[in-house]
């Protein structure tokens, strides 16, 4: 079940609200330009699946997104509990950063916590299988896959070079709850 916890940036210990209904979550995020949709992720894939297998399994959904929204590059992030670089990947994504393009993720297995820092508010979005999240270019955010990650997400880009982050250097992510908290 997707969950949205909304905080003021100065009060990481106490959310202002916690939402669990998709319609409420999507409406709240839409107010700040973020899209959250429920898509069908019924093709069986597991954390650790190869990029080729995941893309092949979800080719119709990928083609639809690329055609509708003009994305030019697709890849897959697939991290399991036994991934040899899970700690390094987690550390990299946990630092607040932004991108020059929209960040689009379609979760086809597992879950992860996308936390968005918009003006003086923090939106922690627990994304799970079937969730498609689209974060506007320039939005400060971080992502937590957890200490024992298990997720597969399809990533779509306008930039042919793929994932390129601009780290803010801010330590705000350290103050807010993580996926395992």
From Swiss-Prot:
Cofactor: Fe(2+); Ni(2+)
E.C. numbers: 1.13.11.54, 1.13.11.53
Pfam families, alphabetized: ARD
Residues annotated to bind Fe(2+): 97, 99, 103, 141
GO biological process: L-methionine salvage from methylthioadenosine; L-methionine salvage from S-adenosylmethionine
Annotated InterPro entries: ARD (IPR004313), ARD_bac (IPR023956), RmlC-like_jellyroll (IPR014710), RmlC_Cupin_sf (IPR011051)
Keyword Flavoprotein: no
Broad class of enzyme this protein falls into: oxidoreductase
Superkingdom of origin: Bacteria
Binding of Ni(2+), residues: 97, 99, 103, 141
Cofactor note: Binds 1 Fe(2+) cation per monomer.
GO molecular function: acireductone dioxygenase (Ni2+-requiring) activity; acireductone dioxygenase [iron(II)-requiring] activity; iron ion binding; nickel cation binding
Site entry: May play a role in metal incorporation in vivo: 96
Keywords: Amino-acid biosynthesis, Dioxygenase, Iron, Metal-binding, Methionine biosynthesis, Nickel, Oxidoreductase
Keyword match Iron: yes
Marked site positions, Important to generate the dianion: 105
Pathway(s) this gene product operates in, as recorded in its UniProt entry: Amino-acid biosynthesis; L-methionine biosynthesis via salvage pathway; L-methionine from S-methyl-5-thio-alpha-D-ribose 1-phosphate: step 5/6
Catalytic reaction(s) noted: 1,2-dihydroxy-5-(methylsulfanyl)pent-1-en-3-one + O2 = 3-(methylsulfanyl)propanoate + CO + formate + 2 H(+); 1,2-dihydroxy-5-(methylsulfanyl)pent-1-en-3-one + O2 = 4-methylsulfanyl-2-oxobutanoate + formate + 2 H(+)
Site (May play a role in transmitting local conformational changes): 102
Assembly with partners or alone: Monomer.
PANTHER family xrefs: ACIREDUCTONE DIOXYGENASE (PTHR23418:SF0)
Task of the protein: Catalyzes 2 different reactions between oxygen and the acireductone 1,2-dihydroxy-3-keto-5-methylthiopentene (DHK-MTPene) depending upon the metal bound in the active site. Fe-containing acireductone dioxygenase (Fe-ARD) produces formate and 2-keto-4-methylthiobutyrate (KMTB), the alpha-ketoacid precursor of methionine in the methionine recycle pathway. Ni-containing acireductone dioxygenase (Ni-ARD) produces methylthiopropionate, carbon monoxide and formate, and does not lie on the methionine recycle pathway.
Family: Belongs to the acireductone dioxygenase (ARD) family.
Protein name: Acireductone dioxygenase
Species this protein is from: Stutzerimonas stutzeri (strain A1501)
